[in-house]
Amino acid sequence: MKYDLIIIGSGSVGAAAGYYATRAGLNVLMTDAHMPPHQHGSHHGDTRLIRHAYGEGEKYVPLVLRAQTLWDELSRHNEDDPIFVRSGVINLGPADSAFLANVAHSAEQWQLNVEKLDAQGIMARWPEIRVPDNYIGLFETDSGFLRSELAIKTWIQLAKEAGCAQLFNCPVTAIRHDDDGVTIETVDGEYQAKKAIVCAGTWVKDLLPELPVQPVRKVFAWYQADGRYSVKNKFPAFTGELPNGDQYYGFPAENDALKIGKHNGGQVIHSADERVPFAEVVSDGSEAFPFLRNVLPGIGCCLYGAACTYDNSPDEDFIIDTLPGHDNTLLITGLSGHGFKFASVLGEIAADFAQDKKSDFDLTPFRLSRFQ
């Protein structure tokens, strides 16, 4: 059988692509080296932020707004356990923060619902938070967080119900291109398609070693908290920048545990076995202490944590482009630790590519040619 589309990597973007392409009537094969959702990539740990006034650059705002529409649609499949939780997101940092300046600019350009608070206003609204006098907060009322593993599980189930073929626990070992399309090699045999999407995450270079993607080991952890830090008490998800530039992110507490991670830093790795479990690097359990001591002093000890990986591009912007020399193969990689919120729209973009539809978005900033 020759498929219309083969998806290599069915984590966040791949799961979405499988669903949207199958829903569009294509004959699709989803593949993954493991059984998604799983613990081997970048999507585990239950939750991911979604921010609209994007501090990483205005070019992302049209994408994230479409992503939000698609997340809302997906959430309707799980109304008893919603995939998107509109908790709000408070972005904290020094008044001269470049990141917060980008957030404010994005909000102004796209007329987003963002409220600016000074230090006293932040602490009055959320007494659990402590910030210096020179800090500001930009509160995104309509943002929140996503249930990452639930989202992937839902997409995969919906795709399967729509007739999508799924080949999991089966690594793709090679990709070949010829006049007839794309062939993938797996331990289970060879499969052909007219087009392919490569969204293999951290280890995409195992298949395409020429790509400028660097795996980085990262950790996040859950710390002892109480009901003051919960959604029920209107405690928001958050990003926070320390005076030294370190960037943190976190979520409202659930079951008396608050999840937090550090966005920058981490350990450069070159193989999967170098991504050692949480606590095998001495700094893992204490990485968030500088932020917690200064900004959330009421949070208690580290309860447990997990390791994941970022697939970093050189400039930490996404790579969305066809494979050089092969216009029938789309790459979506280099998501650099801020990609999950876009998984829905990136999956839709992949499905459009498979249907020979022109994208509704300007993807020029994400081309590989910027690294030449």
Swiss-Prot record:
Its EC number is 1.5.3.-. Gene3D superfamilies: D-Amino Acid Oxidase, subunit A, domain 2, FAD/NAD(P)-binding domain. It catalyses: N(alpha)-methyl-L-tryptophan + O2 + H2O = L-tryptophan + formaldehyde + H2O2. SUPFAM superfamilies: FAD-linked reductases, C-terminal domain, FAD/NAD(P)-binding domain. One of its GO terms (cellular component) is cytosol. Pfam families: DAO. One of its GO terms (molecular function) is sarcosine oxidase activity. Belongs to the MSOX/MTOX family. MTOX subfamily. This is N-methyl-L-tryptophan oxidase.
